[in-house]
Amino acid sequence: MIYRLKKNIEFIIVYRRGKSFANKTLVLYVLKNKRNKDKDGIAYSKVGISVSKKVGNSVVRSKCKRLLSESFRLNYNNILKGYDCVFVARNPMRDSDYFETEKAMKNLIKKAGLYYDEENGIKSN
């Protein structure tokens, strides 16, 4: 199950206290959160997605959000748990397809040191 950042204050905390990583199409803000645990005490990560009106009209913004959500969902098992992540779309994302979006997202997750390759048991930095 993918947990989401929903409240404005959650986004603000990640923006202010977290570290940022950027590439051409995305910006990633990451904050370690020790409180992200389910009933069984297992840690999980939360994701928030932000797409400004500068990126495009509502159709374009919605497409960007869907692409980011799907990329995160499919790569969730390869991301270290216990972090709050906020992805902010930049203008060039309006023209990118799913594969470019996923590549940009993986690039940022690896830059942040949160990517974990399950097959090889390797944490990427």
UniProtKB/Swiss-Prot annotation:
One of its GO terms (molecular function) is ribonuclease P activity. Pfam families: Ribonuclease_P. It catalyses: Endonucleolytic cleavage of RNA, removing 5'-extranucleotides from tRNA precursor. One of its GO terms (biological process) is tRNA 5'-leader removal. This is Ribonuclease P protein component. It is an enzyme of class 3 (hydrolase). Consists of a catalytic RNA component (M1 or rnpB) and a protein subunit. It comes from the Bacteria. Keywords: Endonuclease, Hydrolase, Nuclease, RNA-binding, tRNA processing. One of its GO terms (cellular component) is ribonuclease P complex. Its EC number is 3.1.26.5. RNaseP catalyzes the removal of the 5'-leader sequence from pre-tRNA to produce the mature 5'-terminus. It can also cleave other RNA substrates such as 4.5S RNA. The protein component plays an auxiliary but essential role in vivo by binding to the 5'-leader sequence and broadening the substrate specificity of the ribozyme. The gene is rnpA.
